[in-house]
Swiss-Prot record:
It catalyses: acetate + ATP = acetyl phosphate + ADP. It is an enzyme of class 2 (transferase). Its main location: cytoplasm. Its cofactor is Mg(2+); Mn(2+). It comes from Aster yellows witches'-broom phytoplasma (strain AYWB). HAMAP family: Acetate_kinase (MF_00020). GO terms for molecular function: acetate kinase activity; ATP binding; magnesium ion binding. This is Acetate kinase. The record marks H177, R236 as: Transition state stabilizer. Homodimer. The keyword Cytoplasm applies.
Length: 410
């Protein structure tokens, strides 16, 4: 069964076409700079990689070009071969505690959550509608970043603000990276052969968050109402005193929205180092002895260690610490700096194994009291797996209904 995993941004569209349940990637496609006459389409199969520059005014055109390209390149012979499409949606609010089949009702519910994710949900919705127009009969599913964290208890997701803010405006912690956490959790349960494993996962890419997992469920996570909360990231500040927003607004003669934009886009690595938001640039500058680069990295590592220590206490000990996503999977320096600061817990790094990049590996010594792993995440596969699961559920329900009808009519 061919299933498509879609991840859309305001000016980008990324997807994979997978053969399921074999988990085979047929093609990966990335559309960048949508909305311009210099949009870039990159298509990668097992055998080759093609790149084109095209005029693409909107997502609808992008989707049509993408699907036409699949046929022209003979990746598929007809659109009907695509039996399912899974769309990454950033915010599911409290409405969705699982991925959902896309219907008029569920799409309207997703649209109602745009206030909670004004930068992301509208772009997700545009992409969904574009695919529905081109593939109107195809089974389509929304897979939310937030659903994995809906298992958090109120004491962990509520803020100590006026309670009516939550009742009236749904102000609470929602978290992010849930699809990644779900995938990594399932991988770790298999590795440890333990369904009730207690795990702390560090998802470190340009966006960075942590999650405490107990028996396959999220107990707490570092990102909050938006992805701005938590640890410093590539361009995000992470936690700060909220009063800073008003203070800087007055001192710099900026609107609150502009200050929040600075916290989202001009802070973190970029803000402190003054160099870049890219970890590779920061690490290169650290090697050269750049003190601001060192400081930006140290601040991030310190805050990550704070969360790990807090979650260790919350879970009353852990079976494993896991690093995933771009930085977590590929930076041995990043991992070693964190693990060294956790030595008080008895965790011991195997320096040789820690050299691994982008591959699954146990990176602690045999006598380490806590196991630490590198586990590559695969959000596209996780999305496809959810589409397959919901499609099979629908098929099984149809068969059950038919059987009941047969028995009743007979």
């Amino acid at each position: 069964m061919k299933i498509m995993s879609v991840n859309s941004g305001s000016s980008s569209l990324k997807f994979q076409l997978l053969e399921m349940p074999q988990q085979e990637v047929i093609v990966s496609v990335l559309f960048e700079r949508i909305g311009s006459n210099q949009a870039v389409l990159t298509m990668k199969t097992k055998d080759k990689k093609d790149k084109q520059v095209l005029e693409v005014p909107n997502h609808q055109t992008a989707v049509e070009l993408l699907l036409d390209a699949l046929i022209q390149k003979k990746v598929i012979n007809a659109l009907e071969e695509i039996e399912g499409v899974g769309h990454r949606v950033v915010q599911g609010g409290e409405i969705f505690s699982d991925s959902a089949v896309l219907t008029e009702k569920t799409l309207a519910q997703i649209e109602s959550l745009c206030d909670l994710a004004p930068l992301h949900n509208p772009a997700n919705i545009i992409s969904i509608k574009a695919f529905q127009k081109v593939l109107p009969q195809t089974f389509q599913v929304a897979v939310f970043d937030t659903t994995f964290h809906q298992s958090m208890p109120a004491v962990n997701f509520l803020y100590a603000t006026p309670y009516y803010w939550y009742q009236k405006y749904q102000i609470r912690k929602y978290g992010a990276h849930g699809t990644s956490y779900k995938y990594v959790t399932e991988q770790m349960q298999q590795i440890l052969a333990k369904d009730n494993a207690k795990i702390i996962i560090c998802h470190a890419g340009n966006g960075v968050s942590l999650c405490a997992v107990d028996s396959g469920k999220s107990v707490d996570t570092s990102m909050g109402f938006t992805p701005l909360e938590g640890v410093p990231m590539g361009t995000r500040s992470g936690n700060i005193d909220p009063a800073v927003v008003k203070f800087i607004s007055e001192k710099e003669n900026k609107t609150v929205a502009c200050v929040i934009d600075d916290l989202n886009k001009k802070s973190g690595y970029l803000g402190v180092s003054g160099i870049s938001n890219d970890t590779r640039d920061i690490l290169a500058s650290i090697k050269e002895g750049n003190q601001q680069a060192i400081l930006s990295h140290d601040i991030q590592v310190k805050r990550i260690v704070d969360y790990i220590a807090s979650y260790y206490v919350l879970l009353k000990g852990i079976d494993a610490l896991v690093f995933t996503a771009g930085i977590g999977e590929n930076s041995s320096f990043f991992r070693s700096e964190i693990i060294k600061r956790l030595s008080v817990l008895g965790i011991k790094l195997d320096e040789e194994k820690n050299k691994v990049k982008g591959k699954q590996e146990l990176i602690t010594t045999p006598d380490s009291t806590i196991k630490a792993f590198v586990i590559p995440t695969n959000e596209e596969l996780a999305i496809a797996q959810d589409v397959l699961r919901l499609k099979q559920n629908k098929t099984n329900q149809y068969k059950d209904d038919q059987q009941e009808c047969f028995c009743f009519c007979g």
